[in-house]
Amino acid sequence: MGLVPSNLAREGFKFIFMGEAEACRGCKYRSVCVDGMEVGRLYVVKGVNERKRFQCPIHGELTLASIARANIEVASGARMVEGASFIYRASCDEDCEYRNYCRPEGVKEGDKLRVVRELGKIKCKRLGELRIYEVSF
């Protein structure tokens, strides 16, 4: 569970946690709001408890929500099956139309990921055919 600004508290909303503000350090809601999150990670709102609201000096009204690390789409030259685990290594540094698959936000070099499913293929100018996978942590 965590706290999300009420205007963003809807199932499926995704966000990258950018870190806590200075005002968060002394806040009584800090443990449920920011303590469980890691800077630079992608999170998704899984459910919202509309009855639980709190006031925040930074974001205004906050709503209690179920928050989890979001699945991410990554490109790989390797052929993988559903359920396979692998260590993430960026496949390319080019600034092209597929960069969001090769260096997706929310994933860090060396992360252990698990394949949820294959989503399709892309044709990379540098590496050739790559597969796009939905992955979880």
Curated annotation (Swiss-Prot):
Database matches in PANTHER family: UPF0179 PROTEIN MJ1627
HAMAP family according to UniProt: UPF0179
Family listed: Belongs to the UPF0179 family.
Organism: Korarchaeum cryptofilum (strain OPF8)
Protein name (database record): UPF0179 protein Kcr_1409
Regions annotated as coiled coil: none
Pfam families recorded: UPF0179 (PF03684)
